[in-house]
Amino acid sequence: MAAAAAAAAVRCAEELVEREMSGRDASHDAAHALRVRDLALSLAAEQGVSSPDRLLIVELAALLHDIGDYKYTKDNVEDMSIIKRFLEEVGLEEGQREEIVAIITGMGFKNEVSNKLNAEPTLEFAIVQDADRLDAIGAIGVARCFTYGGSKNSALHDPNVLPRDNLSKEKYMSKEEKQTSINHFHEKLFKLKDMMKTEAGKKRAEKRHKFMENFVAEFYEEWSGRA
């Protein structure tokens, strides 16, 4: 795809994201998608990706990845249809469209919970997935965790509600089970550092993970009245 057409496709994707993700709480809003895009392009540079066509796949997949997030949508099939139609309208080749859709549909934490892994993920897949996971940890991750919990009226912490072990995909996705915001660190966020796939992602995750460990330790100290 020519450079001008690629730039136009990205602008249209940004507009689609703003439109489709409007009204969501700040944990999964358009700003999240834009941060993931920026992280993905930065990781791609560190991983040596320089082909404009490959970078376009990374950028569009990162921008569009949360339009069909199950936590906010009632019809994931329709949301994926919106994405597929958009990719065709902006002139991407069939192979590029298929790769972007594969990244979006396969990159979620819920897929690894259920062991539905892409056995040999492409570098582009790994980059976008790592970028999304980086935005889930560290200072931004802490802010997003409590923002989402607040939007669902979840308790910050309840010592009687323990983190769930060996989560199935169904339990992880359940909107019915009572959970606390602090438990999300144990059930998901603390696990992400060791699930990074690119060397660049692994390196960045170390600092963000340590920040969360310190935060949660301080949280428990303050909750118990010891600090």
Regions found by a protein language model. Give the residues of each.
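Short alpha-helical hairpin
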Residues: M1-E18
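Divalent metal-dependent phosphate-bond-processing catalytic cores, especially two-metal-ion Mg2+/Mn2+ enzymes
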Residues: A2-A5, M21-A30, L34, D38-S50, ...
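Short, well-structured alpha-helical segments
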Residues: A30-R37, L55, E59, R97-T105, ...
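An active-site-proximal "capping" alpha-helix that borders the catalytic cofactor pocket
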Residues: V36, V77-V90
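His-Asp-centered metal-binding catalytic motifs of divalent-metal-dependent phosphohydrolases/nucleases
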Residues: P52-K74, D79, I83, V101-N111
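RNase III-family endoribonuclease catalytic core
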Residues: Y72, G91, R97, T105-G108, ...
